[in-house]
């Protein structure tokens, strides 16, 4: 089975419940989901913040895991204070800056900026994006968690990504014992949108 998990507070759920405000809380919530669905031998795939989430999940609940795939992520993801401030104020410039840092050629996306289509209002920016940025910035257990990974792991990075550059990616991969790395050329941070077919092919090979 392939399951895409929508986190509490994401998307339309913001009207019902607030976002989980830490990586630790998200990992605990994921475990409750997997218990409810009675899932074992998991292959977890995370992108960006999702990499921190599966890192922390692995640290706490490794018995459920079979493999891990980290896409455009690292063991730590500090966020510039100016970006956090813009997001907390609901400023749309926060989304524009994210796309600029993630991929300089973001204007080349057919149909426009994909992040702007997901995060559409000042409320989305202040109540979803700002919470997630703070969660990433405050997470501090990534180094320890990465060193304790025991299952086979794949790391996929975008050559042009400035949010998680290749230097950071190499440092992350060096922490994980049983891992291999794939770099997608001509690609920024939004790997699953920019180079969906190549990413999917590499994951299936893994």
Protein language model features and the residues they cover:
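Flexible "cap/lid" loop of the alpha/beta hydrolase fold
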Residues: 52-96
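Short beta-strand/loop motif that positions the catalytic acidic residue
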Residues: 149, 155-157, 161
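Conserved alpha/beta-hydrolase "nucleophile elbow" surrounding the catalytic nucleophile
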Residues: 42, 46-48, 158
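Conserved acidic catalytic loop of the alpha/beta-hydrolase fold
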Residues: 25-42
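Single conserved hydrophobic/aromatic residue that forms the stacking wall/gate
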Residues: 1-9, 14
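Conserved alpha/beta-hydrolase catalytic His-Asp/Glu region
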Residues: 85-150
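Catalytic histidine-centered segment of alpha/beta-hydrolase-like enzymes
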Residues: 187-200
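Short alpha-helix in the alpha/beta-hydrolase fold that links the catalytic acid
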Residues: 151, 165-174
């Amino acid at each position: 089975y392939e399951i895409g998990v929508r986190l509490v507070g994401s998307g339309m759920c913001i009207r019902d419940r607030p976002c989980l405000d830490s990586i630790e809380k998200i990992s605990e919530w994921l475990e409750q989901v997997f218990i409810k669905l009675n899932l074992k031998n998991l292959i977890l795939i995370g992108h960006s913040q999702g990499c921190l989430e599966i890192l922390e999940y692995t640290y706490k609940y490794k018995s459920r895991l079979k493999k891990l795939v980290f896409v455009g992520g690292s063991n730590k993801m500090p966020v510039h204070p100016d970006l956090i401030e813009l997001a907390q104020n609901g400023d749309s410039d926060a989304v524009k800056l994210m796309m600029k840092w993630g991929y300089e050629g973001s204007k080349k996306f057919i149909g426009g900026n994909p992040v702007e289509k997901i995060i559409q209002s000042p409320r989305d920016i202040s109540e979803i994006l700002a919470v997630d940025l703070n969660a990433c910035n405050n997470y501090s257990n990534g180094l320890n968690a990465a060193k304790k990974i025991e299952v086979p792991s794949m790391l996929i990075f975008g050559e042009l990504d400035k949010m998680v550059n290749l230097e950071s990616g190499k440092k992350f991969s060096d922490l994980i014992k049983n891992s291999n790395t794939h770099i997608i050329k001509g690609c920024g941070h939004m790997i699953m949108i920019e180079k969906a077919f190549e990413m999917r092919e590499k994951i299936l090979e893994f």
